[in-house]
Amino acid sequence: ENSIIIHESIFDTLLEELKKTGGYLVTGEDRAKLKAAMWPDGRQLSGKIVCKSVKVITEEAGISVPEGTKFLMVLGEHIGPEDMFSAEKLSPVVTLWKYKDFDRAVQMVIDITGFSGYGHSCGIHSVNEEHILELATKCKVSRMMVRQPQSVGNSGDWENGMPFTMSLGCGSWGGNSTTENIHVKHFMNVTWVSYPIPADIPDADKIFAPHFAKYGK
């Protein structure tokens, strides 16, 4: 997970649970050191950090963490270039964000994906179908995992119907040709054999009736 947006009512509780599973909250001067190690020039993520362990990352940053730490956490301060922790990190470093109402949470997802790169993915841990649909329709993401871990669910699982892949399409949002998980189908050549058929021409007045009713023809 790259960022976790948490309702204020459970923020402290979830933070403690994350610590129990091996998370360590990096704050103060250590947060600044970690940021400098991850983005030495202030914008480009360092190759020394990508896909590296907590041990390698903390040594590079010159900070100490408890033995057994599995991932690092930081509190999000701003979304955008003024706080690169809102960007994609490609490492066991997760940014925690707090929200009060769901509309704000949706906007935060929109802003984070907009800064990190539209078209990739997001997730939601909820049983509220209205919230699930709202997030899916408002965010420019190609995948949305519902009550699932992102890293495992996005790339395919027997229990979620997503095709197995190591390459995630991001659609035109991300400069790709498809929003699908790239798999064997996309490497197969298909020949379309077309025969003449009776014409079935759609009625434009019916198709655009709501638009014409609202704006005129």
Label the predicted regions.
Residues E1-G80:
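ALDH superfamily catalytic-core signature
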